[in-house]
Amino acid sequence: MAAPAKVRFGITGFLMFSLKDILEATGGTLQSGAPKTRFAGISIDSRTLKPKELFLAIRGQNFDGHDFIAQALKQGAAGIIYSEAEKAPKVKKDVASVYVPNTVMALGAIARYHRERFDIPVIAITGSSGKTTTKEMAAWVLSAKYKVHKNQGTQNNLIGVPLTLLSIQSQHDLCVIELGTNRKGEIHRLTQIAQPNLGIITNIGPAHLEFLENVKGVYKEKIELVRNLVSPGIALLNKSDIALARLSRVKTRPIFFYGINRDCEFNATEINYKPDGISFSFNNAHVMEIRHCALHNVSNAMAAIACGLFFGLDIGTIRERIRNFDSPEMRLKEIRLNRCVVIDDSYNSNPQSLKQAIDLLCRHGQGGRKILIMGDMMELGNKSQEFHAYFGNYISKKPIDLLVTMGSFSKWTSESARKSGMRTEAIVHCDDCSKVLEFLGANVKEGDILLIKGSRAMKMERIVSFMKERD
């Protein structure tokens, strides 16, 4: 692939790519169109495509973009990229048409081409949990001084990361992205595309074991971020994580550590829980405060503080930004309703983040009943029963007044909790969401604190919405 010239402020105006650029980036085969043809942007969704954009036909789990090529052309697409020749309609000679073996790989190649046009730092964040909060917190801190570009929500996969990079514009000074994975090789590919200068790993835990097999597999996958940083890249790792702490012996590139009560460059001590958050001492010199009662958010804050210092922010500005940061939606977001308190952690779940959330619920200072509404943890493979049963035992020993489980896997949790001595009347299992809503509607009392958590596929946000509407 021919490397494009570095142009810091070179992407201006309406037209972004020429057909020649696309062919250089992807190595695709030109079927029609003039090399000087220019495109206003890249689209993978015919519903939102704008005139003069290039349409990539991507096959997803529930759709195939090749089925929408005709619609994209009707809406004014100036060209198409496809991988299934039998589904590609004939186009006019002036419409660009490019064949590639894999359109997802082509999207990544175009995104890398675009990223190389900008001489700006890219900060990449991965980990088994805490990616999104750390990304949002780091971007929030850095935006006090810089124009920061970031993923929207959790666009952290082989489609979302390229789309994020493709929306970098000349006004941006920094890009902060999270990298997700549930299969071997994805972090390696994402780093090839994003070419990060600073890599942050929040932790290593039992997540996506269905495809990564075990925690060692998770470690091998996540550590690809450190191995593939653009030279002389800097790695920033959580020393409170046992697996990551071992990397202090690796000298292939600069590695800095953050942690809680650890011997490291960015250290939090003197943790003090308050009704509205946590205060802590940064490097025994600066008192910091966060508006969250979850201890792991101190670790997330330490990563954001380190980013601020790396990029020249003064400690006073960093302190103010950290103090005013608000949690992303659906991630331990405390919602105070008239009758009860809802802790919305409904976006996703794995053993590590579930334990953190349960511990937060147990520390909550409000005096009402503590209710855990738990949905299945997905992608745990042959460890699924073991982990769900483990949490039944764990919960039975915690000051939790009521356990409500939902889904086929979490039934192992309710059964384990009962066998471990939790009162039968304090355990309710529901097969589906409608039964959960029916139970909560009849049984939630004034002053109760509800933690709602489950994997993305469980759509636990439906329960959060119900509680808001009920209030």
Provide a role label for each language-model segment:
Residues 12, 23-24, 105-235, 239, ...:
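Phosphate-binding loop of NTP-binding sites
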Residues 14-124, 133-144, 166, 419, ...:
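Short, basic phosphate-binding NTP loop
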Residues 19, 25, 83-93, 200-342, ...:
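Acidic, Mg2+-coordinating active-site environments of NTP-dependent enzymes
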Residues 22, 53, 72, 110, ...:
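Residue-level signal for inorganic ion chemistry
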Residues 69, 73-74, 191-192, 396:
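Non-catalytic positions within long, well-ordered alpha-helices that form the structural scaffold/packing
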Residues 125, 329-333, 457-463:
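ATP-dependent carboxylate/acyl-activation modules
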